[in-house]
């Protein structure tokens, strides 16, 4: 298996346990550049994107480029290799939803020029481009909208609610609640 990763905000030690595995090949690559992987490919998993608000607010143009050029490059690679591709999207495509819970036919309420707009729009464009490749080229695609991931090796200063709460608890601080505290979230442990 080959993996093409751009390591913005990722620590290599988090995947060091995979390096000795015979079936694992690691490629360090910027997906916004042309992607070539030698040999046959069955699947491409496109998870490249900053997901932390701390990161995507620092690198807004790169975030948009990964969602557009990076996705285009990986869809092109999938087409060239006759590979299936899974695109990791996000609940952020819904923006600040007016409907709870959101169904897949809900289009969302996104502020395209707001602070989160770069991430939200990168993912919305990524989904549209993926569907265009599917409909126009017949590429076998899947899109998964992942909600609020959390798990081991997550940075406590990530900018998302679970690491923020964990960091505050570990420091013996009160947990910061925004608004009236009645917000709901769906979480995905990874």
Which residues fall in each region the model found?
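Glycine/proline-rich active-site loop of Rossmann-fold NAD(P)-dependent oxidoreductases
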Residues: 124, 139-140, 149-164, 171-173, ...
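N-terminal Rossmann-like NAD(P)+-binding domain of SDR-like oxidoreductases, especially those catalyzing
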Residues: 1-149, 169, 179
